[in-house]
């Protein structure tokens, strides 16, 4: 071999010689990146300029399609801040995490401007007749029927019974309640915190404190406060406030579309009908008898019914006196009133017509006649039409609720510590409720007769929202020492009336956002009617709503795409909350097991010491 020839050692890895070349190629590719000139970000809001965005060091590599700006734009929320805020308010109405009232308007573009507000309150329901200083632990239980009402001035209604033989409020209890409600004109006894009593049935309605001193609309429905309104969200949270020793109880919860109707009271049915009624007691001695005839405030001589007690008494004297309570007598002097008496078979024994003068008139009957029924028929030339809000009582029996909707949910109250019921909107379009619909609200049941319904002279004065459901929570098996508390949050959107003090607070409404409306609708379709109490108290529902909104990509624009995306996001958020709940249970179980183990070790140590 030639000594001048040098042999290089063989390379074990051919790629080692290309290492420097590869590094140089990478540096060249990086240098070939295109630099973007500095740009100025657009104006984000009126009167505010965003900071200039310096993209001098931003590079776009060839062959790459995942541009950071595009990716961020695709993953941003598809809704405006006002739309997102309304979704939070609608799906989580009792959450204390958002308090801005201007963000509570419905983004449907239905009205150009409006004002909005919020009603808040906390009330408790105590077993009727229970002394607040006592705590009975005798094992007695009571049912409580809670209605989450879509009324503007009264959000809650409580009904209960003191009959120990009834597990829940029965149909007979509801009939007694409806009859008393429809004929009640003085609501002092039936307004929180007072219970109105009808036999063994008790009920009370919870008013909105903010509207206590606000004058109601006139008889023509003209309001000095607003022309129309609509609820934007409403929710009630029940806190199961029960002693530890007797903390049993079950709640069955559902929501129903209100079967309601705003109608004119038909005077043809009422005015020309002879009213029959109640027990007449023979007062004192002598030939005279007195019947006091009460006429309610609504009976402005125009034909509303005058309910009288059923007459049952002995032989009538020859003359008697019919006395009207002049304080409530509202028909004009000079109108004719017809009085009739009948025998038990129903034959007419006498009929008298006289003219109302000073409120007292004397009528004469046949000697020895037995009065069976007494009636009054008002003869009028002018009839007073009255607006009423007729509404049917929804299913309240636990079995009926289960049959009426598969989304009925049941809670064991000592486990859930209560419940959280956001009220759902069942209408596809959020309509406005006119102030002219203000009038008596009267309940009806499948057993209510036409005669009894049209003879009613009372009813709670209010308006019924056109969109939201009526929530029903049948709580049963609770100890009589249980005092559940209820928190109510309600938001509304209204068009102020001329000269209204709410007028200066009106502002423009957000633009229509179909994505936000679809998100809210899809959520309510997939979720139950109520949640455990911790979904409000611990913010679990707020976290689910926020996570769902954050996961909806901007590029999903069609309604079908939004619905599918929301479904996936809700399932993901639900699984997250469920996993958190599972981990919490595992941690509690681990703590219990650890405590048992420590106790066992201590016990073994003590036994060892004793043996020594």
UniProtKB/Swiss-Prot annotation:
Transmembrane segments: none annotated. It is found in: Virion. GO terms for cellular component: T=4 icosahedral viral capsid. The record marks 536-537 as: Cleavage. Residues 24-34 have a biased composition (Basic residues). InterPro entries: Peptidase_N2 (IPR005313), Viral_coat (IPR029053). The keyword Plastid does not apply. Residues 1-53 are annotated as: Disordered. It holds the Pfam family Peptidase_A21. Keywords: Capsid protein, T=4 icosahedral capsid protein, Virion. Residues 11-23 have a biased composition (Low complexity). Belongs to the tetravirus capsid protein family. Self-assembles to form an icosahedral capsid with a T=4 symmetry, about 35 nm in diameter, and consisting of 240 copies of the two structural proteins. This is Capsid protein. The lineage of its organism: Viruses, Riboviria, Orthornavirae, Kitrinoviricota, Alsuviricetes.
């Amino acid at each position: 071999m030639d000594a001048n020839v040098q042999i290089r050692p063989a390379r074990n890895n051919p790629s080692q010689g290309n290492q420097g070349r590869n590094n140089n190629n990478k540096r060249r590719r990086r240098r070939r990146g295109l630099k973007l000139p500095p740009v100025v970000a657009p104006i984000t809001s009126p009167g505010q300029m965003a900071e200039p965005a310096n993209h001098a060091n931003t590079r776009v590599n060839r062959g790459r399609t995942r541009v950071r700006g595009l990716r961020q734009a695709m993953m941003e929320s598809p809704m405006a801040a006002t739309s997102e805020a309304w979704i939070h308010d609608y799906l989580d109405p009792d959450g204390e995490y958002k308090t801005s009232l201007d963000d509570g308007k419905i983004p449907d573009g239905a009205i150009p401007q409006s004002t909005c507000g919020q009603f808040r309150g906390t009330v408790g329901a105590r077993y009727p007749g229970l002394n607040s200083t006592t705590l009975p632990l005798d094992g007695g239980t009571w049912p409580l029927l809670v209605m989450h009402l879509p009324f503007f001035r009264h959000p809650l209604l409580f009904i209960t019974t003191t009959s120990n033989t009834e597990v829940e409020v029965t149909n007979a209890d509801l009939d007694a309640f409806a009859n008393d409600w429809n004929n009640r004109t003085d609501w002092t006894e039936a307004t929180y915190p007072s219970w109105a009593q009808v036999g063994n049935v008790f009920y009370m309605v919870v008013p909105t404190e903010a509207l206590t001193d606000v004058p109601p609309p006139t008889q023509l429905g003209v309001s000095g406060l607003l022309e129309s309104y609509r609820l934007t969200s409403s929710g009630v949270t029940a806190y199961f406030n029960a002693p530890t020793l007797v903390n049993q109880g079950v709640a069955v919860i559902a929501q129903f579309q209100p079967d309601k109707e705003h109608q004119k009271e038909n005077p043809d049915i009422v005015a020309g009908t002879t009213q029959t009624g109640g027990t007449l007691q023979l007062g004192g001695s002598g030939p005279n008898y007195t019947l006091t005839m009460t006429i309610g405030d609504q009976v402005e001589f125009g034909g509303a019914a005058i309910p009288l007690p059923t007459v049952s008494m002995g032989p009538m004297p020859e003359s008697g006196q019919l006395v009207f309570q002049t304080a409530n007598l509202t028909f004009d002097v000079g109108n004719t009133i017809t009085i009739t008496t009948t025998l038990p078979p129903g034959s007419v024994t006498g009929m008298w017509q006289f003219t109302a003068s000073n409120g007292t008139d004397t009528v004469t009957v046949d000697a020895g006649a037995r009065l069976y029924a007494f009636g009054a028929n008002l003869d009028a030339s002018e009839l007073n039409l009255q607006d009423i809000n007729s509404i049917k009582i929804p299913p309240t029996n636990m079995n009926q609720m289960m049959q009426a909707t598969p989304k009925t949910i049941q809670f064991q109250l000592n486990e859930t510590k209560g419940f959280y019921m956001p009220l759902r909107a069942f209408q596809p379009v959020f309509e406005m409720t006119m102030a002219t619909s203000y009038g008596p609200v009267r309940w009806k049941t499948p057993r209510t007769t036409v005669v009894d319904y049209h003879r009613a002279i009372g009813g709670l004065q209010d308006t019924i929202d056109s969109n939201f459901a009526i929530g029903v929570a049948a709580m049963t098996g609770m100890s009589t020492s249980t005092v559940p508390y209820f928190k109510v949050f309600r938001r509304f959107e209204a068009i102020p009336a001329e000269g209204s003090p709410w007028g200066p607070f009106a502002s423009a409404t957000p633009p229509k956002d179909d994505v936000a409306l679809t998100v809210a609708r899809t959520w309510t379709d997939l979720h139950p009617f109520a949640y455990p109490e911790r979904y409000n108290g611990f913010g679990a529902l707020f976290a689910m709503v926020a996570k769902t909104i954050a996961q909806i990509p901007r590029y999903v624009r069609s309604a079908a795409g939004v619905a599918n995306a929301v479904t996936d996001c809700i399932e993901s958020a639900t699984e997250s909350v469920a996993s958190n709940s599972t981990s919490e249970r595992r941690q509690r179980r681990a703590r219990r097991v650890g405590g048992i183990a420590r106790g066992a070790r201590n016990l073994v140590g003590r036994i060892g010491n004793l043996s020594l």
